[in-house]
Regions:
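Positively charged, polar, low-complexity stretches
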Residues: 8-11, 22-26, 44-69, 92-94
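N-terminal first-folded block
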Residues: 4-34
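Charged, alpha-helix-enriched surfaces in structured cytosolic catalytic cores
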Residues: 4, 44, 83
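C-terminal structural segments of small proteins and small subunits
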Residues: 66-103
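Conserved catalytic alpha/beta core of Sir2/sirtuin-type deacylases, generalized to analogous enzyme cores
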Residues: 1-3, 103
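Structural motif
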Residues: 33-34, 37-40, 59-60, 75-76
């Protein structure tokens, strides 16, 4: 069963509201509402993501994996749709608060 976050990311991909990869996120000019990174992201890329978090004034979350994405080599992505980003933030903060995975 897919998690809610996986579903929301899937909706954002279908809508075309996702930026893939640290370099693309760093060069992106429009507003980004939430940043997501995997645990396997390199330390240098984590620094880039932190700079982007400050630049875009948004939240940055670490997620277990992105195996559900077709782009298997993707370890960082940004959501550019406010409503989907808000839904992801709500679910992720609830998970972090409760210390459990929400399906």
């Amino acid at each position: 069963m897919k998690s809610k976050i996986e579903s929301y990311i899937g909706f954002a991909i279908k809508k075309g509201s996702v930026v893939f990869g640290c370099d693309s996120i760093e060069r992106f000019k429009k507003k980004i509402f939430v940043l997501l990174e995997t645990q396997s992201l390199s330390p240098n890329s984590r620094k880039v993501m932190e700079k982007c978090r400050v630049k875009f004034d948004c939240k940055l979350f670490e997620i277990e994996d992105f195996d559900f994405l077709k782009n298997k080599n993707c370890k960082a992505l940004a959501i550019c749709d406010k409503s989907l980003a808000d839904a992801i933030v709500k679910v992720k903060e609830a998970e972090d608060k409760n210390g459990e995975h929400i399906n």
